[in-house]
C-alpha cells in the first residue's frame, strides 16, 4: 500500500479539474499553507465531511531512556491532533470490510 503525496494531489487536480500542472501544485501548496497558518494562530481547522485538526497542550511528564533506564523529563509541548469526521469514519469502515 502506497502513500498519497502532495504531488499525487496536484496530479489529480491537473487530470480531473483541468488546472495546468503549475496551478495544481500551487493550489495544493496554498491549501496546506492555510491549514498550517490557522493552526499556528491557535485556530481549529474544520474540514466538513473529513475531520478536524486541533491543537492540544501536553503537560510535562516523566519519561525513561530506553537504553539506560534513566528517568528523564519529557517537556511540555503543543501537538496537533486529528479527529476524523463521521463520513470519513464510515468510508474507512466500509473499505476495511472489503479486505480479505
UniProtKB/Swiss-Prot annotation:
> What SMART domains does the entry give?
BHL
Kindly list the cysteine pairs connected by disulfide bridges: none
GO BP terms: namely: DNA recombination; positive regulation of metabolic process; regulation of DNA-templated transcription; regulation of translation
**Would you tell me the Gene Ontology cellular component terms?**
cytosol
Alphabetic keyword roster: DNA recombination, DNA-binding, Transcription, Transcription regulation, Translation regulation
Q: InterPro entries per the record? A: Hist_DNA-bd, Histone-like_DNA-bd_CS, IHF-like_DNA-bd_dom_sf, IHF_alpha
Matching Pfam families, A to Z? Answer: Bac_DNA_binding
The entry lists its GO molecular-function terms as:
DNA binding; structural constituent of chromatin
Q: Which family does it belong to?
A: Belongs to the bacterial histone-like protein family.
Q: How does it assemble?
A: Heterodimer of an alpha and a beta chain.
What does the UniProt function comment say about this protein?
Answer: This protein is one of the two subunits of integration host factor, a specific DNA-binding protein that functions in genetic recombination as well as in transcriptional and translational control.
Query: What name is this protein filed under?
Result: Integration host factor subunit alpha
Q: Which organism is it from?
A: Hahella chejuensis (strain KCTC 2396)
Amino acid at each position: 500500500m502506497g502513500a498519497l503525496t502532495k504531488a499525487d494531489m496536484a496530479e489529480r487536480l491537473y487530470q480531473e479539474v483541468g488546472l495546468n500542472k503549475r496551478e495544481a501544485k500551487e493550489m495544493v501548496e496554498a491549501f496546506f499553507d492555510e491549514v498550517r497558518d490557522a493552526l499556528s494562530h491557535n485556530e481549529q481547522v474544520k474540514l466538513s465531511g473529513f475531520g478536524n485538526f486541533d491543537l492540544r497542550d501536553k503537560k510535562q511528564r516523566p519519561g525513561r531512556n530506553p537504553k539506560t533506564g534513566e528517568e528523564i523529563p519529557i517537556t511540555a509541548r503543543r501537538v496537533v491532533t486529528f479527529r476524523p469526521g463521521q463520513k470519513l469514519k464510515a468510508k474507512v469502515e466500509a473499505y476495511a470490510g472489503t479486505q480479505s
